[in-house]
Amino acid sequence: KREAVAVDINDKQGSVYQTEDDPSGLFYKFIPKSKNKLDGEGKLYALSIKGLVNANNSKAEIKIGDSLKTSWVSILDPEATSKKTKLQGIEKGGTTFNGSEGIIVDTNNLNQSEIYFTCKSGGFAGLGQIWRYNPANDYITLFYESKSKDDFWMGDNITISPWGDLIVCEDNDSNACKLIGFTPKGKMYVLGKVSSQRSTEISGVCFSQMERRWG
């Protein structure tokens, strides 16, 4: 099941990246036959990280900032008529991610696309990860992994702020979910926090075109 999609507008092929909200979901790329016709034919792929069956980092061997070589495996039955796309990808070496959620495309200072996505339950502590994929060099980087609920607890929806920082919404069933910012170099800060007597998540963060207020 797909959770979120993001279109790489810098890509001549019009690649569409997709997350899968599943404890063993894959990270997908759809390349349309016609760039401006996303409901038409195309090819579906799943990401494979070299030497890594899953990206959950259960042994804490991957450190924040580590970059890993990737490739893409073909999903031959994208409509899953006989087998789930997840199973097709895993059989070919696709790497699984734990609870992939929000996704956004940004552009770095080299004018290269970078695709950020969250894994709400990923990481050694199970508190969440943020991954950054660079299609120009086919590497994926562990941008952030939480070790403490007080710092970062199950990031979900994400966006890019007008000043270039990554903004992440927490969704952890508590009554104090936070809105967290990350600079491009990974420095984290808290923008706000829910104050409620009930469990409340933050979602759908965006900015107005005027760049002066929250959307």
Give the ranges of each region predicted by the language model.
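Sequence/structural signature of beta-propeller domains
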Residues: 1-215
